[in-house]
Amino acid sequence: MNEQVLIKALVEHAYLEGDFVLRSGRRSRYYLDKYRFETVPELLGALGERLAIAVAEHEPEVARLAAPELGAVALAAAASLASQLPFLIVRKEAKGYGTSNRLEGVSESGELVCLIEDVVTSGGAALQAVETVREAGLVCRTAICVVDREEGGSDELARHGVRLWPLFRASDLLGQVKSVVNPHG
């Protein structure tokens, strides 16, 4: 799936207009519903391939991927299959039973990990995942997301030593929305 076709598919499946409160607490007139694109096999497969390519380009020495639950796990699994890199699931909090781990999967201290994210707004969820990964003795200096909403998340991650590489920016998708609504400019 080429870039323009993928952008169009993301807009068609995930772009919603209305009055939304985002995880960051901010209000928005639009919402990118990650579950609407992560649950479509054709889109998930195409995104997994693009994420794997981006990981190889921006963090070629990486040992494994990591993804915050729940939203980015399907993306990390798709990228893992495409890249053959193992991945970790980063829990928001330790479960109260079993291993009580915040990181699910196997890793060794000192390994280089690349964070996979879905939609980044303020960077809060990504930063929490990076902190969890680092507390486990792993190195994380790169995050790759499907969409950067361009609302400060990249800068916030940079302040903590993490470079964000988006597959797409909100402006890419919003430009597609405008062309669908008014195709003649």
Where are the language model's segments positioned?
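PRPP-associated nucleotide enzymes
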Residues: 1-116, 120-185
